[in-house]
A protein has these predicted regions:
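An alpha-helical appendage that flanks or caps ligand/catalytic pockets
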Residues: 13-121
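Loop-centered beta-sheet repeat module
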Residues: 1-16
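Structural preference for beta-strand elements that scaffold enzyme active sites
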Residues: 3-5, 36-38, 123-125
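C-terminal helical cap(s) of enzyme catalytic domains, especially alpha/beta-barrels
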Residues: 17-25, 133-149
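Active-site oxyanion-binding pockets that recognize sulfate/phosphate
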Residues: 5, 98, 133
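Glycine-rich, proline-tolerant flexible connector loops at the mouths of alpha/beta enzymes
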Residues: 9-10, 127-135
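Short helix/strand-capping connector loops at secondary-structure junctions
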Residues: 119-129
Length: 149
């Protein structure tokens, strides 16, 4: 009878299963009459898709470090980082970020709407791993605007 939050930025492939189990097993309580699902996930938003892809290279580096056991602090973005990766690394990063959204305002709006439709989430909890603090704040502002549209 409590809300449930799932961190899809850690285990995106388990998202739908986890939500289904939560909803199936939910029992109303004094705190909550019906299920309330929160989906946590990565969003990198910028003024354009291209700028978002560039900023996302910091996230891609972080994920690659997690997957290879080379964890570091968040690193600055790298031009054409994705193109420098082999197909296996690209696939692994894409799988890790499967529930994520990267793009300009329209792409983010469409991506979040798709995620909302697929999960029937009541709320999103966003992580935006952007290296520059001002651009991270802007990413969150663009994301908030996309959610209002």
């Amino acid at each position: 009878g409590l809300p449930y939050a799932f961190a899809s930025h850690f285990a995106p492939r388990m998202l739908h299963q986890a939500l289904a189990i939560y909803r199936q097993m939910f029992k109303p309580s004094a705190a909550l009459a019906k299920p309330y699902a929160i989906v946590g996930g990565p969003v990198i938003a910028a003024e354009t898709d291209e700028q978002a892809d560039y900023l996302a290279s910091s996230t891609h580096q972080r994920v690659l470090g997690i997957l290879t056991g080379n964890r570091t602090r968040l690193l600055p973005p790298v031009e054409n980082f994705w193109q420098q990766l082999d197909a296996r690394s690209q696939a692994a990063i894409a799988d890790f970020l499967a529930a994520g959204v990267i793009g300009g305002p329209d792409t983010v709006q469409l991506g979040l709407q798709k995620l909302a439709d697929e999960t029937q989430a009541d709320e999103f909890m966003i992580v935006s791993d952007v290296y520059d603090a001002d651009l991270r704040l802007r990413s969150l502002e663009i994301t908030a605007d996309a959610m209002k549209a």
